[in-house]
Amino acid sequence: GVGSLGTRSEIAAELILHGGTEEQRQHWLPKIASGEILPTAVFTEPNVGSDLGSVGTRAIRDGDVYKVQGNKTWITHAARADMMTLLARSNPDQRGYRGLSMFLAEKPRGTVDDPFPGEGMSGSEIEVLGYRGMKEYEIAFDGFEVGADNLLGGEEGNGFKQLMATFESARIQTAARAVGVAQNAFELGLNYGIERQQFGGAIVRFPRVAGKLAWMAVEIMMARQLTYFAARQKDQGRRCDL
């Protein structure tokens, strides 16, 4: 749960750092860095999943605001967030990736009883089996307004390109969390194998148990080293998604 908070802040910060206007950088980055605001990533839609080129949520310009219409799902920490990095289709005549724009959409922070008090949006929590610290939500937008100044970079149609530039860092951070979860599972399993007694000895001595633990150690080490390698590549300005 705590690690996932960092991922959303990282995505928002990289989007603004690399794609935002100077005014957007000055306004948002200090608040994200200090923890004054909590961002959330609002990309995924029902029946769309990772196919972001098929995003159907629309953001239509109306004077000094964009009016957002559509549905999003699997939005992490959405209720308590203060700002949404919102991917929406600003040009409905352009299909695929070209008609997408990224918005820095402000919203009031919600509560358990009233997760989305902002006008033009509603939603509810999605029950999950694991990762209980990560609260997931589905959101419906019905005329939700975003200021035109909150269009990332000030130009429409760059949303997909801007988003792809951030995913490397987010995936490295997610990989690091996965390695940590796996390491903890391994240590719990190893301790249980040492403490659990059967047939006059610890079950860790049984070949089947020892073999499973050994493969866990090998695969965790591989994942950890690959994560470190990707992080080094990113730090050195090289591609790290290959």
Protein language model regions, located:
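C-terminal helix-coil-helix/basic helical segment that borders enzyme active sites and/or dimer interfaces
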Residues: L190-V204, A217-L242
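Extended, low-aromatic, Leu/Ala- and acidic/polar-enriched alpha-helical coiled-coil segments
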Residues: A176, P207-A217
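FAD-binding core of flavoproteins
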Residues: G3, Q24, P30-E187, N191, ...
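Short, flexible active-site-proximal loops enriched in glycine and acidic residues
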Residues: G1-R8
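Hydrophobic alpha-helical transmembrane segments of multi-pass small-molecule transporters/permeases
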Residues: I11, R171, V209-K212
